[in-house]
C-alpha cells in the first residue's frame, strides 16, 4: 500500500491542473480504501487477456497469465544484472586535438593550427 501512497501523493503534488492538486497531507492517506486492512481483501488475480490480442498464441499458457509470462521473460535479465561491468578503455590523449576530424570538410577548408601573435605576418610590412 506504500507504493500507492507515494504514487498518489506524487500525482497530487506535481499535477498543477488536477483537481487533486494540494500540498501533501499524510492524514488524507487514511481515507484511501487500500489503507484499511479489512477493506483490501486478497490480492486480485491477474485478469485473463482476451484471445483476440494474441491470435497466434491464444492457446499458450502465457497468453492467459500475463504476469507469469512477464516474470519468466524478465528472469534472465534479472539474473544477468549483478554482473560487474568491464572497465572502460581510456582513449589516449593525442597531441593535436583536431587529429580525429576529417582532413577535408566539404563546406570549408580545414582549419590551420592557431599561431601565436608574434609569429603572425605583419599587416603593413611593405618597404
Curated annotation (Swiss-Prot):
Membrane-spanning ranges: none
Q: Where is this region: Disordered?
A: 39-127
Q: Where is the composition biased (Low complexity)?
A: 102-121
What are the Basic residues biased-composition ranges? 85-101
Kindly give any further remark recorded in the entry.
Contains several arginine residues in close proximity which may be involved in protein RNA interactions.
Q: What is this protein called?
A: Cold-regulated protein 1
Query: Source species, please?
Result: Hordeum vulgare
Amino acid at each position: 500500500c506504500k507504493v500507492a501512497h507515494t504514487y498518489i501523493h506524487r500525482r497530487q503534488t506535481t499535477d498543477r491542473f488536477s483537481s487533486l492538486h494540494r500540498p501533501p497531507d499524510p492524514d488524507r492517506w487514511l481515507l484511501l480504501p487500500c489503507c484499511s486492512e479489512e477493506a483490501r481483501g486478497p490480492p486480485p488475480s491477474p485478469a485473463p487477456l482476451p484471445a483476440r490480442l494474441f491470435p497466434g498464441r491464444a492457446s499458450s499458457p502465457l497468453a492467459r497469465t500475463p504476469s507469469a509470462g512477464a516474470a519468466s521473460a524478465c528472469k534472465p535479465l534479472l539474473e544477468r544484472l549483478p554482473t560487474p561491468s568491464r572497465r572502460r578503455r581510456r582513449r589516449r590523449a593525442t597531441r593535436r586535438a583536431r587529429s580525429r576530424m576529417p582532413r577535408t570538410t566539404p563546406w570549408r577548408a580545414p582549419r590551420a593550427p592557431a599561431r601565436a601573435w608574434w609569429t603572425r605576418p605583419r599587416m603593413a610590412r611593405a618597404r
